Amino acid sequence: MKAIIEIAQYGVIEVELDPEHAPISVENFVKLAEKGFYNGLTFHRVIKGFMIQGGCPKGDGTGGPGYCIKGEFSANGVNNPLKHLRGTISMARAMDFDSAGSQFFIMHKDCPYLDGQYAAFGQVTKGIEVVDAIASVKTNAYDMPLNKVIIKSIKIEK
C-alpha cells in the first residue's frame, strides 16, 4: 500500500506503508488521508538533519483528529522492528505513549535513538529530494517554516 503525498510548490513524496508492523498507525493514516483530513495542512515543524513534521489541523503542533491511537513501538509493548532511517515515516506524539492522532514526521536523516520510542509505519520510496528541499527551508526559533509548506493532498494506492 502506497501513500502519495503532494506538497504545493515542492513535488511528490511516495511512501510505502507497512501495515504488517504498524497496522493501527497505517489504518489511521489511510483513513485520515482518504477523507481529505490532511488536504491543506502544513509541515509545521522542520529541523534540517532530523525530520519534517506535519498533519496538525491547528498548524502549530497542538492539534489532532479528536482522538488518539495506540503507540506501536517496543517501549509501549508492541513489536515494531521498523527503524527511524532517512525517509522513514512515523507517528508524532506527546509524552504519553498512546497520544498519536494525525501528526506524522518523515526522517531527514537516520535517528536510531527514536527506534522503539515512536511508531514508524512506512518508508519513502520516491521523492526523498522533496524531503531534502523541505528540510532546507528557513524556519523561525520554533522550527516553523517562515513560508508555509502545504500538503495539497495525500492519496492512497492499495
Indicate where each model-derived feature is located.
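Cyclophilin-like peptidyl-prolyl cis-trans isomerases
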Residues: 1-158
